[in-house]
From Swiss-Prot:
GO terms for molecular function: DNA binding. Belongs to the TFIIE beta subunit family. This is Transcription initiation factor IIE subunit beta. Recruits TFIIH to the initiation complex and stimulates the RNA polymerase II C-terminal domain kinase and DNA-dependent ATPase activities of TFIIH. Both TFIIH and TFIIE are required for promoter clearance by RNA polymerase. GO terms for cellular component: nucleus; transcription factor TFIIE complex; transcription preinitiation complex. Present with 1150 molecules/cell in log phase SD medium.
Length: 328
């Protein structure tokens, strides 16, 4: 068979003309042990080779040795040949091995495609969350174009349709705006005072519910408290507002210092003396005087020790006593 008519040689030459990568070392034969080329010995000291040393050695080998290609012919095929290139370079250290390409139609390709589908779904949910938070923080109607610019979306994005289906988001088709429906529609000091005046009970308004539609309400609450217009219950740890009430009693700082000191100097009796003090003043205490309660002492039963009866034997008188049991 001539060289021009050899199909294997023709495929090899065509493959060489297309491939312009680094030289590839042929795979080791079956049964041949793989040498550890990652370890070198210099002056009796053994250490791992660096990536630069290995790259330099590969360059020298490519200049000395030809490219070895292993061509495997597929069984039962007369027209196609499979060309396999096996890289024998060990890249365990430094993580310098190149990333492997995923073959189309393989299991890895299907897993990658499924993963990309999940990422696209999660990306839509993330954009929906960002849009909701943006509308909530604004505290006022937001234009659709403003929301699209903020999220870098197009007008036909499906996130817009998902926003219209949310219960806490109101869409105005005439104005083209989105509005967050908070627990209390309060966004100014006057609206807060109006809400507190309209309360029938003294339960108070939760600041957590106020921040649902008005995240920046802390500054307004502090200012209204300074003006003695509202009453605020704060946490003990960081003094953040918890509940607010409308102050219908006037200025909170109008009490003279003299009365404040008088109130602080009043000493309350001890808990045990409180019922007797009330009786001396002609008042009936709601609780029983602890001094009138007789203490009931529990009688402790002492168990008597039983005396154990020991065995009485006459073994020391066996020679003196006589046995008359046969006469009975």
């Amino acid at each position: 068979m001539s060289k021009n008519r050899d199909p294997l040689l023709a495929n090899l030459n065509a493959f060489k003309s297309k491939v312009k990568s680094a030289p590839v070392i042929a795979p080791a034969k079956v049964g041949q042990k793989k040498t550890n080329d990652t370890v070198i010995t210099i002056d009796g000291n053994t250490r791992k080779r660096t990536a630069s040393e290995r790259a330099q050695e590969n360059t020298l080998n490519s200049a000395k040795n030809p490219v070895l290609v292993d061509i495997k012919k597929e069984a039962g095929s007369n027209s196609s040949n499979a060309i396999s290139l096996d890289d024998d370079d060990d890249d365990e250290d430094f993580g310098s091995s190149p990333s492997k390409k995923v073959r189309p139609g393989s299991i890895a390709a299907a897993a990658l495609q499924a993963n990309q589908t999940d990422i696209s779904k999660s990306h839509d949910s993330s954009k929906l969350l960002w849009a909701t938070e943006y509308i909530q923080k604004k505290g006022k109607p937001v234009l659709v174009n403003e929301l699209l610019d903020y999220l870098s979306m197009k007008k036909d994005d499906k996130v817009i349709e998902l926003l219209k289906k949310l219960d806490r988001i109101e869409f105005d088709p005439k104005k083209g705006t989105f509005k967050y429906l908070s627990t209390y529609d309060v966004h100014s000091p006057s609206e807060l005072l109006k809400l507190l005046r309209s309360q029938v009970t003294f339960k108070g308004i939760s600041c957590k519910d106020l921040k649902d539609g008005w995240p920046q309400c802390d500054e307004t609450i502090n200012q209204l408290e300074e003006d003695s217009k509202i009453l605020v219950l704060r946490t003990k740890k960081d003094k953040t507002p918890r509940y607010v009430w409308y102050n219908s009693g006037g200025n909170l700082k109008c009490i003279d210092e003299e009365f404040v000191k008088m109130w602080e100097n009043v000493q309350l009796p001890q808990f045990a003396e409180l019922p007797r003090k009330l009786q001396d003043l002609g008042l009936k205490p709601a609780s029983v005087d602890p001094a009138t309660i007789k203490r009931q002492t529990k009688r402790v039963e002492v168990k008597k020790k039983r005396q154990r009866k020991g065995k009485i034997t006459n073994t020391h008188m066996t020679g003196i006593l006589k046995d008359y049991s046969h006469r009975v």
